[in-house]
Structures are given as C-alpha cells and as structure tokens.
C-alpha cells in the first residue's frame, strides 16, 4: 500500500464498522446508511447522545463501531451487538455536511472538521471526534500496519 506524500494531505484512521449519517434536528436524531436506509432503531445510544448536541440541525458523517479491549474497532463485535449481544456502540464522527441549515459540503474539509469538533462534547464515551493528521502519511501507514490497524 502507498499513501500520498506531502504536507497538504489529511490522513485518518479507517474504522471497521458501519458508515452512517446521523441527522439531528427539531429535537430528533436519525441514522441512515450510505444507501439511504433508516437504521435509527439499530443505534439508540448513539442517537440519544446526538439529540443532546447544541445545534438546531446537523448532518454528521461517521462510522458506528464496537471497540475491543485492544482499542481496535471490531466488525464482528459490532454485528453481534446489533443482534443483541452486550456491547457499547460508539460513533466516530469524521465530517460535518450541514450545520444549522447551512450546507457545508463546498467548504474545505479542515473547516468542516473544525466545526464538527466544536459541536461534539469533548469527553463523550459514545460520540467521538475522529481526529486526523496532516502530512507524514508514510510514517502513519507504517505505524498503523505495525499496530495491526487498517
């Protein structure tokens, strides 16, 4: 595997979970798959926390995951949790597409991520900001591979 070189590239962790869009508005929150299916009933704890965000509305892109004892996302554990096995499902948010009625999709990614980080609680066990690193892609890939991450 190779990664782009240079200091202008953003590098993020790849999580092994379900990518979902969380929509918040009018005191409600919903979860949708990439294909538009409403999976809100599958992520009640994520949506309960999303309802508490101090926004009029937001559309947040991220990954629903179960983190194992080693701190790695575990897809099988997530599938088991969705079938009723006891586990905490976390949501790693990595992009903010809409905020308080404003479409942010034409804004630079770093600006969107800054706004996203500002609306997420600093210490929340379920809603988490997915951080990024600017540049040093080869070094980061090497470290991720050494740690058994994707």
Per-segment meaning from a language model:
Residues 1-150:
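Catalytic cores of nucleic-acid ligases and guanylyltransferases
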């Amino acid at each position: 595997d190779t990664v782009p070189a240079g200091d202008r590239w953003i590098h993020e962790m790849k999580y092994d979970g379900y990518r979902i869009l969380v929509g918040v508005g009018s005191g409600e929150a919903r979860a949708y798959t990439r294909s538009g299916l409403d999976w809100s009933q599958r992520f009640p704890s994520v949506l309960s926390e999303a309802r508490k965000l101090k926004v009029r509305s937001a559309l947040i892109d991220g990954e629903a995951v179960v983190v194992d004892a080693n701190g790695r996302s575990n897809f099988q554990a997530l599938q088991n949790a969705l079938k009723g096995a006891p586990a905490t499902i976390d949501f790693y948010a990595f992009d903010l597409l809409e905020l308080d009625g404003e479409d942010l999709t034409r804004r630079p990614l770093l600006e969107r991520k800054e706004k996203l980080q500002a609306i997420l609680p600093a210490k929340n066990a379920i809603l988490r900001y997915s951080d990024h690193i600017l540049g040093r892609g080869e070094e980061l890939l090497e470290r991720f591979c050494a740690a058994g991450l994707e």
